[in-house]
């Protein structure tokens, strides 16, 4: 490329190639961002209210900026490195990646849990299940030594097992999963939050047949979404959260519940209790399955949104 200016020739292409770093830096420094613009960038994925909450969380957790700070122009005062970091995070949000994975943590039961791709992000419904177990824990008989032994099957981030260990201090809590990532993240969260949890790699579908009256409580939030339901799921969940922790075959939606419940028939102590978070579409079927296995005092509860979501059964 060649241009002529006031009779002087200049090689524009050579100039751009030689000075591209300077020009790029100059351009990025001139970019101005405001809160509304950030929200608009992800409004095609989330509704405006949720998009606003996500951007607020991102700015607060990653840059220490409150909404008041942002309204007072704090975005314009970000350093060049911070601006680049924010832009990178926004690009990830635009691709549908959950904000919890981007900031590396999620709130659960008043605590912050480390999360990363490969473990499910804790949900509010699971907090309700934990509350139910905590409320009934005083009525659960311990073993001969007075201890109460709790098992979390499919621990994921450890949100259930770690929380129960902290909320029920007289309990000895163990956690199973088949994912190296899940076991590592659970261990990380237990250490960070000061909880004592024994962590094991164990497949729920191949639980030890020789276990006899080990546990006072078994709790699980296993995979329960049928493959056919995937088309109704949100993009950020479907494309980014681990499918092995979400889905079961359409032909056998109770696969994990049945396996864990069968294990519980011999691994739970007399008077022991089984707690499940369930697929809202299969509440009655899950109750019937538990009855057929000999469980009693079965209770099906709805979550805060009015959906069948939790079951407790006694043995």
PLM-predicted stretches and their roles:
Residues 224-256:
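Mobile active-site "lid"/loop adjacent to the S-adenosyl-L-methionine
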Residues 125-232, 259:
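Conserved SAM/SAH cofactor-binding pocket of Class I
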Residues 46, 137, 190, 264, ...:
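Conserved hydrophobic residues forming the short capping helix/wall of the S-adenosyl-L-methionine
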Residues 103, 201-202, 278, 302:
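Short loop/edge segments at beta-strand edges and connector loops
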Residues 60-136:
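Conserved AdoMet
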